């Protein structure tokens, strides 16, 4: 059985979602607190094909160190009603490898994510958590007019949710590690559909 984490005083985002009748929150990843959790998630059978991080805990610790030291991105843990369930990496697209594949603006943001807890699959919450993280990025910097994504063409489930989250397909691109769909979510369209 999943346990709620200890109460968080440093949530970066927290909002009740009436569509799923649950509270969605995000907090910065903390290495000491989250290492075993992220290691377990990276080794889940449903995560391995996309992330390719089924590695010893020492490798995940090094991965966390690199991400925490990287000024172009921030790692987050996603929670539903206080229970950790997902991992997110928010990045500045212009400073990311993706920024070489389209004319990135200075304030464009992007994210990578995984749902680590299998018990959260098939519950109809994926669009809600995607919208919540996208909203968080728009709120985090009012200058951000576009949130971008580059899911693998093989990530059919994630691609299926894109239109319900105001993401529009821009075409396919060949990144160093995958063939991907370039996706844009514009602030104005997001606000029209979901508000901030």
Curated annotation (Swiss-Prot):
Keyword set, alphabetical order: Plasmid
Family: Belongs to the IucB family.
Organism: Rhizobium meliloti (strain 1021) (Ensifer meliloti)
InterPro entries the UniProt entry points to: Acyl_CoA_acyltransferase, Acyltransferase_MbtK/IucB-like
Pathway(s) per entry: Siderophore biosynthesis; rhizobactin biosynthesis
Biological-process GO terms, alphabetical: rhizobactin 1021 biosynthetic process; siderophore biosynthetic process
Pfam families: Acetyltransf_8 (PF13523)
GO molecular function terms attached to this record: N-acyltransferase activity
Protein name: Rhizobactin siderophore biosynthesis protein RhbD
Source superkingdom: Bacteria
Entry annotated with the keyword Acyltransferase: no
Keyword Transit peptide in annotation: no
């Amino acid at each position: 059985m999943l346990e709620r984490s200890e109460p968080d005083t440093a949530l970066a985002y927290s909002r009740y979602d009436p569509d799923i009748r649950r509270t969605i929150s995000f907090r910065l990843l903390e290495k000491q607190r989250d290492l075993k959790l992220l290691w377990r998630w990276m080794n889940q059978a449903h995560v391995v094909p996309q992330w390719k991080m089924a590695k010893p805990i020492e490798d995940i610790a090094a991965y966390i160190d690199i991400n925490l030291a990287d000024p172009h991105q921030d790692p987050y843990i996603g929670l539903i009603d206080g229970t950790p369930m997902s991992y997110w990496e928010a990045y500045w697209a212009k400073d990311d490898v993706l920024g070489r594949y389209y004319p990135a603006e200075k304030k464009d943001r992007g994210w990578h994510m995984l749902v680590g807890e299998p018990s959260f699959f098939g519950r109809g919450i994926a669009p809600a958590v995607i919208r919540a993280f996208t909203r968080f990025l728009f709120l985090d910097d009012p200058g951000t007019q576009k949130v971008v994504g580059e899911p693998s063409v093989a990530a059919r489930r994630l691609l299926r949710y894109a239109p319900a989250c105001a993401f529009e397909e821009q075409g396919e691109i060949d990144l160093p590690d995958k063939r991907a769909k370039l996706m844009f979510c514009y602030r104005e369209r997001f606000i029209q559909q979901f508000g901030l």
